[in-house]
Amino acid sequence: MIGGCFDPEFRTWSNGLIDDFRARRFNLVLSDVTAAEIRRAPAQVRELHTELAELAENLSVTEEALYLLEQYEAHRVLDSRFRNDMLHIALATVAAVDVLVSWTFQHIVRLDMIQRFIGANLELGYRPLAIYSPREVTTYEREV
């Protein structure tokens, strides 16, 4: 989502959501997994992540999140090449985050994939996790 701030296709909505975080309209939650991925990103993305990390709650990888990741793999929710994406969702699920926000339409922000995660979560005793794109979440161009 942070990288979307610098992508012509996604910047309007990504920056709108970043403004929402800065205005404290929503609580931002990041993770150690996000930080590790950002290390490989362009400098402007790393700089924005550093700024946002000051506003955010940070989630560390826990045994419970790793267990849930293994369950997602066992349920074949996603292909194993998307292990980090499943870990993001496991971390958010275990932490009872309200919404996971992503621009990854290929295998996350897609109804059938969301239903797979919800099904696995319910079967394993976790609540469903809402998954949306920044455009669906930001208050940009809406009355607040």
Residue ranges and their predicted role:
Residues 1-30, 37-50, 74-79, 114-117, ...:
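Short, well-structured N-terminal submotif of metal-dependent ribonuclease cores
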Residues 24-28, 54-57, 98:
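Short active-site oxyanion
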